[in-house]
């Protein structure tokens, strides 16, 4: 059994190279595969391996005070979904190219999966405001599934989101907007940018779609959640669409 993990942390990294070297050494020591992005704004990880080795790696990482509160999302597969280990240093751990959307300067308010499920059941938030779920993912990902009635945008990359959202601004003015993505990292930046751009009615879904699946299942969601590895997509029970032996 392979344990698949997704995790990120926005935190100031003074020396990304030193962190990247340490992560690479530990991941190799524990025979993990996947991808890790390190930047001055934090770290973004997708790693898979044996349960004991995954546990040892994250115990090492979270012993660092910068990552002690990092939330790790887990799922299982019969086979390793990554071909190799890649650790890279980038300008951002998720490219958005907006100076007005830095999670190092603050965090937009969030809504938990349990609360969002109740809002979806009621068709409104706790104050009686209409609800709009904003999918911040690419069209390729949305094709595999999204929340029922979500506002989806015809974008190919995250940096396209501000322009694609502009025609919808008026329709969102009187609603509570919940931005969501796969694991939380994109909707965190998107919600911050929307706040900075004058929208004071924006929340982010805590933990993203995968966190929602993990905590409350698939209620209100149609289809699967696309992931960027050989599993292709996960259903609300976090089971992969593809679970094949790469070596066969």
UniProtKB/Swiss-Prot annotation:
The active site is at 181 (cysteine persulfide intermediate). Pfam families: Rhodanese, UPF0176_N. SUPFAM superfamilies: Rhodanese/Cell cycle control phosphatase (SSF52821). One of its GO terms (molecular function) is oxidoreductase activity, acting on paired donors, with incorporation or reduction of molecular oxygen. Transmembrane segments: none annotated. GO terms for biological process: tRNA modification. Keywords: Oxidoreductase, tRNA processing. Its EC number is 1.14.-.-. Residues 127-221 form the Rhodanese domain. Belongs to the TrhO family. This is tRNA uridine(34) hydroxylase.
